[in-house]
Amino acid sequence: MPYSINNLTNVKKLSGGSENTNYLITANNHHYVLSLFERKSPDHVKVLEQLLSHLNKNNFKTSQTVSTTNGQTITYWNKKPIIIKHFIEGKIMDALPNHIIELVGEATGKLHQVPAPDYLPKTIDYGQENFKLVNQYAPKTSFKDWILAIRRYIQPYLTIDLPKAFIHSDLFCSNIIISSDEKSVTIIDFEEAAYYYRVFDIGMTIIGLCSEGKVINQEKVKSFLIGYKKEIKLTPDEEKALQPFTVYAGAAMTFWRHRSFNYVYPNMGLKNHYKALQTLADYAKAQSSLFFKC
């Protein structure tokens, strides 16, 4: 191994997403996480490593990469990129209590104040710009009708000059490490980061952290917004756009799951995985705008 990580005592595969495979490595009583990127290009992984370095240099708490003995931060196995990061002590919870969600809101507000580097993508792979792809892979389906109806619904809000920032765009429970005393949180996994609408990130976090089954918990939404507003005050236009962008975020992830597991990487076990998020997007759309106020 080209790293100065010696005396390996344990390697354990971690549960994780479909985009990479993660292993917990123990050596010399220190823990590390090795991420093997199954589907990301070397260029994409290079940007991710640069982002982590950029975040740490700007005093945003997140993962820190480990360099090889000759200073490289990316290596390869079977032509697939690898990054090793220092393990962050803490826990991941499947459902977050309100006080933790408030901490995540505050951390998200801090993230949105980190200067966005020029190389940060200006769009997201599952954004509304790509919803039209449904015409190619799923024409004459009810899903096509649904996703294009959502696109029409959000169009008026895309013409507003809404603030953009360095966003995470994938803030679900699996990407948040909570300290043992539950007084701090660390946001990880910036693989989908972009320079995009702040309110999209807020909407995605509402979908990712504030949902309970088929509904969204309003008190959790309020907790997140209370934390966020400790760092950033929403503009009047963002206040108006929050509900549509929550719908947009839910639809975007629905689109990603539908396309990924039915067409790009067909998986019979996950073919209906998109429906839970579709239900949440519809739920958000059906609420009064007051639901998203705090």
What are these regions (language model features)?
Residues 1-9:
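Juxta-kinase regulatory segment immediately upstream of eukaryotic protein kinase catalytic domains
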Residues 199-232, 249-265:
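Active-site activation/catalytic loop segments of kinase-like enzymes and analogous catalytic loops
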Residues 81-95, 131-132, 251-267:
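A glycine-centered beta->alpha junction motif in the catalytic cores
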Residues 27-118:
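ATP-binding pocket architecture of kinase catalytic cores
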Residues 94-142, 162-164:
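A cross-family kinase active-site recognition segment
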Residues 18-26, 33-34, 65, 155-200:
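Active-site acidic catalytic loop and adjacent metal/ATP-binding pocket
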Residues 12-16:
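Protein kinase glycine-rich loop
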Residues 253-294:
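ATP/Mg2+ or Mg2+-diphosphate-binding catalytic cores
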